[in-house]
Amino acid sequence: MFEAGLPVTTVIADRPCAALSLARAHGAVDELLDRKGYGGFGPAFDRQGYTATVTATLVAHQVDLVAMAGFGTVLGETVHSAFPARILNTHPALLPAFPGWHGVRDALEAGVEKTGCTVHLATLEMDAGPILAQEVVPVLAGDTEETLHERIKVAERALYPATIAWALGELEAGRSIYPPAPPGAQPR
C-alpha cells in the first residue's frame, strides 16, 4: 500500500509480522494487537474483547477506511458498527467460490481453469461480504498451491491498492462504498 502512494496512517497486526516494521519505516503508527493476549487462535479466543480493542485503536487514530490484508481474524460487530461498509478485505479466490482459509488449495482440488483474487467488504461472516472488485488468474498445468498463490498475489498487489484508492475517493466525495453510487451521482 505504501508503494502505491496510499495514505496509510495506521497498521494493526494480530500477530508479529513484517507489516509492522514496514509501517514504522513509512512513518505510520504500528500496533501489535496480538491474539495471544485474548486466548490465541483456539476456542478460548475472546473475539468480543479483541474486537473492542481493535475498534478503540482504529477510532483513536481517526481511521477513515480499514483495509485488511493477511489479518487472520474475523472481527465482531463492534468494529462493523464503528466502520459501516468501510472495512475491505482481500481473498485469494474468485468469491463466492472457495471462501475460507484455503481458497487456493480448494480451487486446485476442484480442478477449475481459472481462479483469482477478490476485494470485498468484510462482514461478520468470513468472505461473505459484497464483492467490490475481482481479477482473474488462470490455473496452469503443473500449478502447485504455492505457484498459483504467488501469481494470485501479483494480481492482488495491483487490484487491492486500486480498489482502496477508489474507495477513498468515494468517501472523500461523500459517497458510500456500498452500495456503489451510480455513475454521475452527486455527493450526499
Each predicted region: which residue ranges?
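One-carbon transfer enzymes
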Residues: 1-188
